Amino acid sequence: MASLDNLVARYQRCFNDQSLKNSTIELEIRFQQINFLLFKTVYEALVAQEIPSTISHSIRCIKKVHHENHCREKILPSENLYFKKQPLMFFKFSEPASLGCKVSLAIEQPIRKFILDSSVLVRLKNRTTFRVSELWKIELTIVKQLMGSEVSAKLTAFKTLLFDTPEQQTTKNMMSLINPDDEYLYEIEIEYTGKPESLTAADIIKIKNTVLTLISPNHLMLTAYHQAIEFIASHILSSEILLARIKSGKWGLKRLLPQVKSMTKADYMKFYPPVGYYITDKADGIRGIAVIQDTQIYVVADQLYSLGTTGIEPLKPTILDGEFMPEKKEFYGFDVIMYEGNLLTQQGFETRIESLSKGIKVLQAFNIKAEMKPFISLTSADPNVLLKNFESIFKKKTRPYSIDGIILVEPGNSYLNTNTFKWKPTWDNTLDFLVRKCPESLNVPEYAPKKGFSLHLLFVGISGELFKKLALNWCPGYTKLFPVTQRNQNYFPVQFQPSDFPLAFLYYHPDTSSFSDIDGKVLEMRCLKREINHVSWEIVKIREDRQQDLKTGGYFGNDFKTAELTWLNYMDPFSFEELAKGPSGMYFAGAKTGIYRAQTALISFIKQEIIQKISHQSWVIDLGIGKGQDLGRYLDAGVRHLVGIDKDQTALAELVYRKFSHATTRQHKHATNIYVLHQDLAEPAKEISEKVHQIYGFPKEGASSIVSNLFIHYLMKNTQQVENLAVLCHKLLQPGGMVWFTTMLGERVLELLHENRIELNEVWEARENEVVKFAIKRLFKEDILQETGQEIGVLLPFSNGDFYNEYLVNTAFLIKIFKHHGFSLVQKQSFKDWIPEFQNFSKSLYKILTEADKTWTSLFGFICLRKN
């Protein structure tokens, strides 16, 4: 790639080159990242300036001959021209705000007529040329490309669409005559038409900025903004690959900085009590980096904010991380990257915080409104002390800003690897959506109109890769709202469709709202109420600061993952009191120890083998799915739609986290669309069935399979519960559908207790190296297995030494009830039968399988039933 000055010099020399005297020499400026919205913005801006313009139609056929582009072009209604186009040099502007701007020097040389063949590329071009001056003309071209069989099949139709519109084409009506859904390309080019010797690099930069300013009046500010981000990145990143992403604009400030994670109960349980952590308040501001660079003082946030200068003498750089209040130009620092030229990113937070206060004082010395956030180091695990610490931060009324949450910072890690968590009250959790008015006449039942309201659809942004891995589909009406060129990009809008509320993207906007015209805008919204298949949304504000971002075609509100993880705070509310006392309802929170490795691997192997039996099925329901321990197995099996049901909201929230973890870190051949339903399975089958059938897209005939791993003992309290379970399975399954249960076998447990003469309230134990590994406490006195209601206490690998009560499963009674409700027994098998297969699967793990492991495993079994 040449420098811009060298390219201009080469251009000027071309006119003195005798070998090029019959050639057309072209110097063009091209913008390579143009979508319909950007194209339309520039077009309408030029029309509004009443610049002289002409419209032309042409068909260019391009044939590759010895790596050269041989062209036949017909500018209607003229004759065909034959020429070859040869590039000589190019220069590409590196700043992201230039939209891939490239200066190209090329020559066109006349050639003989040639014959077209099936390899030809056909480009139909509808071009409007704006003569902005004697030196420059700006060409805006709508292009349709056809190749191979498309040429004969579609050429005539697209000639009509592009050239022979019902209404005569003018610059004022052109944008209304072209349908952006017809898979067009959009090109903006600037061609130099002045005297070659008069051209300078500065002229090129000036006209380039003229066009970019039409797209964004703040283009020059955006360029400075990206340069500031590059400066910050140069002190944070060491990888040239990552720095290149910053320079290209693929990464912005948000991707560069370590992100604060919305904290769930499951997150907190992993490090509760948070001894050693630092806490501070969450201000209702925006993330910003305060920088002293040479003589300039500025903040990089959603844009570049200049705060002043240091005077004539340049200072060594200082870079602080914090929250910024744009209206008051106030900065509140919570971390430091560099202080007076000393890079601090590899130090732990407990060390960096010492330099943070010094950096704040430097800003204050230049009359900048800056302050260090108040931090408390947590030193006690006592819940009462923790409560006082959290209250002193969250309920402090003397702060100069409103507080909407608490930040917890982990010590001991580098700047980029510091884990920072954010807790907010449910009410203060909001999401940013791109809002579009729902197209009319879609005839979609879920889009039913409501009197006094207008239906709008809520969208967020998603990468093409994540869209595929989550097996998402576009909602009805999507293609009417977004042109195909936007849909074909690597990052595009998608309806907000969280796993527990697939129709959360529906928003009924009141006709009486003070927010009148919201179509096409980014709104900050909060959830007021969650009902079956309906969410009541409230508008907090219009994000006016995001409207320019929309024009780039790369921003559509929150990212899908960020939006759904934030949404979890509505699904599983995390109270302020739980910060001190620890999260409530954390069933099976403990971790397994190493002594369970082989036995756990055996159980996992068996569940994997069972789930593989339902591979590639369309709809599968998991009863008691918990936090998704089997999610990876369903993904490996290629299940297309998975409905997970559980009454534990915290577990379901963890499942959603796992959904994204699998999508970003594991490779699966097939994608699975995951739905979760917060539901107590002991409630009436009719009510549960109705909720499942209301899941968007769930088939009327029912699911292919129902799976329940190690859960049904919760539903063996009485006969009514077992009957209810059988009825539920019958209502949810299609004819011929299968039920797959894994469970502890009640008859085998009773046999074990009898063999070891375990009486009421006594405990059977299996020890390993004097450590109790497995244990069952007898909580019933009957000598024979009852149909239901017999309790035992079980010591589980992850229960931290506590016994969990459950009911014995009388499998004969269970099968009897299911047969009564229209099922047939397909298979019943003990887990011990899988041990030989496990030996073949992993000889190394089998070798460390102990007798206690084998005894414990033999207590479990598998039951398969088919709906008649």
From Swiss-Prot:
It comes from African swine fever virus (isolate Warthog/Namibia/Wart80/1980) (ASFV). The record marks K627, R658, H713, E806 as: mRNA cap binding. S-adenosyl-L-methionine binds at K607, G624, D646, L710, F711, I712. Its EC number is 3.6.1.74, 2.7.7.50, 2.1.1.56. Its main location: virion. It holds the Pfam family mRNA_G-N7_MeTrfase. This is mRNA-capping enzyme. The active site is at K282. Probably catalyzes the second reaction in the mRNA cap formation pathway. Forms a covalent complex with GTP. Keywords: Early protein, GTP-binding, Hydrolase, Methyltransferase, mRNA capping, mRNA processing, Nucleotide-binding, Nucleotidyltransferase, RNA-binding, S-adenosyl-L-methionine, Transferase, Virion. The keyword Repeat does not apply. Residues 594-868 form the mRNA cap 0 methyltransferase domain. The keyword Lyase does not apply. Part of the viral DNA-directed RNA polymerase that consists of 8 polII-like subunits (RPB1, RPB2, RPB3, RPB5, RPB6, RPB7, RPB9, RPB10), a capping enzyme and a termination factor. It comes from the Viruses. Pathway: mRNA processing; mRNA capping. The N-terminus contains the mRNA 5'-triphosphatase domain, the central part contains the mRNA guanylyltransferase, and C-terminus contains the methyltransferase domain. It is found in: Virion. It catalyses: a 5'-end triphospho-ribonucleoside in mRNA + H2O = a 5'-end diphospho-ribonucleoside in mRNA + phosphate + H(+); a 5'-end diphospho-ribonucleoside in mRNA + GTP + H(+) = a 5'-end (5'-triphosphoguanosine)-ribonucleoside in mRNA + diphosphate; a 5'-end (5'-triphosphoguanosine)-ribonucleoside in mRNA + S-adenosyl-L-methionine = a 5'-end (N(7)-methyl 5'-triphosphoguanosine)-ribonucleoside in mRNA + S-adenosyl-L-homocysteine.
